[in-house]
A protein has these predicted regions:
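Serine/threonine-rich, low-complexity linker/repeat segments that form flexible spacers/stalks
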Residues: 23-82, 187-199
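Beta-strand elements of well-folded, non-transmembrane domains
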Residues: 75-79, 91-95, 157-159, 173-177, ...
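Hydrophobic residues positioned within well-ordered beta-strands of beta-sheet architectures
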Residues: 69-73, 85-87, 149-154, 167-171, ...
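Hydrophobic membrane-insertion alpha-helices, especially the h-region
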Residues: 2-13
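Hydrophobic single-pass membrane-insertion segments
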Residues: 11-25
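A surface/secretory-pathway sequence property marking extracellular, secreted
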Residues: 41, 47, 94-135, 191-193
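Low-complexity, serine/threonine/proline/glycine-rich extracellular segments that form mucin-like
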Residues: 64-110
Length: 199
């Protein structure tokens, strides 16, 4: 009798759940790091000039099936209220910005947040970097409000433009006065990208 009751309970359980989830996908498997060929963590600060400004994050390099290159930069940053230099991300000419998402300053209104990222494109053919994304930088060299935030930058290789086997991405931070001259980029790091399409 006990065995029969157990079998009946198991059968009822199976019947109930098989009908409950019938036709549905109960398990989802996200593909992790699909196409990623390089990962570069970074950290840079302006403490050397007495500013509490820093940026940390990761650069992800993706090789697409068509041979193109996708680069995503995810960064957490904090900018000193006395720092007019902010943070700048510099890219070579074969990359174009697809998406720029920022929460800096995270305690600001949506209008304030939208007003802080700036993208500059140089026409100088001799310059190593062509595109500059600046967060919290005042080109009038006036102290900003400072604050914290997160930044997501997505860049794509320009169609029909050759992708070098290796190229740099630059990140600078801080603005200060040196010998009477205002200097943008108190500290600067270069991230070497050695892009290679994977089979």
């Amino acid at each position: 009798m006990l065995v029969a009751m157990i079998l009946l309970a198991v059968a009822a359980y199976y019947f109930f759940y098989s009908n409950l989830f019938k036709g549905t996908n109960t398990v989802s498997h996200a593909i992790t790091n699909q196409g990623i060929v390089e990962i570069h963590p970074f950290a840079v600060s302006a403490e050397s000039v007495g500013l509490h400004s820093f940026a940390t994050g990761t650069v992800f390099v993706e090789a697409s099936d068509d041979g193109s290159c996708v680069i995503r930069i995810v960064s957490q940053l904090e900018i000193d209220p006395e720092d007019w230099g902010g943070v700048s991300f510099s890219m070579p000419g074969h990359l174009t910005v697809k998406q720029l998402t920022s929460s800096y300053p995270e305690d600001g209104t949506l209008d304030e947040i939208a007003g802080w990222p700036a993208t500059w494109i140089s026409t100088d053919t001799e310059q190593k970097y062509k595109t500059f994304i600046e967060i919290g930088r005042d080109r009038g060299h006036h102290s900003t409000r400072g604050g914290k935030g997160s930044v997501l930058i997505e860049m794509l290789s320009v169609p029909n433009m050759p992708i070098p086997d290796s190229f740099p991405i630059g990140i600078s931070i801080g603005g200060y006065n040196k010998n009477g001259y205002d200097v943008m980029g108190a500290e600067y790091i270069t991230i070497p990208i050695t892009f290679k399409e994977r089979e």
